[in-house]
Amino acid sequence: MDSILTIVIIVVSSILVLLMIELMIRNRSYKDIEALEQWQQEIKDKPVADELKRVKDLNMTGQTEELFGKWREDWDEIVATILPKAEKDLEGARKYASQFSFRKAKYAMNEAISNLDEADNRITDILNELQQLLESHEKNSAEIDGLRDVYRNMKKSVLAHRHMYGAAEQKIEELLDVESDKFQKFEEATANGDYLKARDIVMSLEEGLSNLEGMIQEVPDLLVECQATLPVQLEDLLQGHDEMKKQGYVLNHLEIPKEVRDMTKQLQTCLIDIQELHITEAAEKIEALKTRLDTLYDQLEKEVHAKYYVEQKTIRVYDDLEEIHEQALETKAETQFVKQSYQLQDKDIESQKIIEKQMHILMKRFEVLQLRVAEQDIAFSVIREELEEIYEQCETLKVLHAEYKEMLQAMRKEEFEAREKLQEMRNMILETKRLMQKSNLPGLPESIMEELQKGQEAMQAVYGHLELKPLNMHVVNSELEEAYAIVNDVSERTQDVIGQAYLVEKLIQYGNRYRSQDMDLAYSLDNAERLFREYEYDAALEQAASVLEQLEPGVVQKIAEFVDNEQTS
């Protein structure tokens, strides 16, 4: 019994759910149908009829009449056929939805959408075309009078200033006639109701008059350039060229007379372009001619600056070469003198020869350049380039010569410094011997004495090299450095030994107070004294220090610090 009840409840619940779903779908279908009905009403409300009435106010002939008939037919078809079909489809869709025939309702709605879409698009096209026609009429009416004023003013200006246009006047008159014909065609198109065609004519007038206005403004200026400004500048250029040649300038390389003839021909082609109203081509040619003319003027100016440079720099270079020549002769003599006393390296001798050779080359080049200037067969700009190069090489040669001269002076300076160094080393040895005598040492270790002897011999060898003629400073400096290292080492080692010996004496003196109390100590101190007398100061220090440290730890450090303070004070 319970199971049957459960089944009944499930079945009833399912039926209710299905019913609710169908009700929801139906409500949604109703909403879609209502939206389509609203769209249909919006289409009906579009002001096609009102716009068509506006067209009737125009000249109903020609193009306007033809378009009006087409739009009327389209509108009648939409109202009589397409929209009723859509309305019938929507009624069917509502009926099917109420009967829960949703598939049929959907199909009917799609048919309605198709018809409404077609109607909407066709109406939009009609309205756009209507608007284009009406706007064309309105714009034409608003703009044509302004264009007539522009044309009249242009015509008056050309007639009043026809002398400013020269041979181009005829072409301008022809173009004005072309624009005048457009006004006639505009009136005809408007009278025939061809408003769209009239619109095209208005736009053509705007473009044509704008172009013509630009030409009318540019032609006078271009004619002035071609007939007055540029010819005068070309004549001035030619006169300037001839005047400069009389003043001694060499200008054949510029070929200015030929350039002037070529540019004069170009001016004639520009005049032809202006006559034919090829304004862009004429303007480009004139700009090219101006650039070409400026370049030629710049080249003449370059020659003027070059001549001034040559006149100023020639004197400077001449003086520089004379100075270098005199200094080179002095340096050559100084080199011969130095070679008698010093041994020069091959590279140093070669440097002097190179300087002398370069000097002769520069003097020869300068001499040839002066001849060319006197013969007046070369442009000053070319002379300037050659003179600049000679001047730069003179400056370089000055530097090389100064360096070579400094090298010669340095050799003498090196000899003087070497002798000073030897005297310094001699003083170091004397000071070392004085310290030994003052310290009352019994003598120095054999190794130091041998090193001292070696240092003295090295110094003697340097003295010997300094007496040789020619003097080889490279060898002198090398052996001098070696001798100084030996003597300096001997001096430092001797000072260390003296300090070490003094410390040994102090340690032995300190240990003597314990000598009678400790036989081992006495023996060690005696041994230290023996080593001291045999100049074995390292061994003596080690012997005395070790025995005292055993007896009194730290005493050696204290005595060493005392000795250091005593020697530095």
Curated annotation (Swiss-Prot):
It is found in: Cell membrane. Keywords: Cell cycle, Cell division, Cell membrane, Coiled coil, Membrane, Septation, Transmembrane, Transmembrane helix. It comes from the Bacteria. The keyword Cytoplasm does not apply. The keyword Nucleotidyltransferase does not apply. Residues 26-569 are cytoplasmic. Residues 1-6 are extracellular. Residues 103-149, 273-336, 383-440 form a coiled coil. Pfam families: EzrA (PF06160). The chain crosses the membrane at residues 7-25. Its main location: membrane. GO terms for cellular component: plasma membrane; septin ring. It is a single-pass membrane protein. GO terms for biological process: division septum assembly; septin ring assembly. Negative regulator of FtsZ ring formation; modulates the frequency and position of FtsZ ring formation. Inhibits FtsZ ring formation at polar sites. Interacts either with FtsZ or with one of its binding partners to promote depolymerization. Belongs to the EzrA family. This is Septation ring formation regulator EzrA.
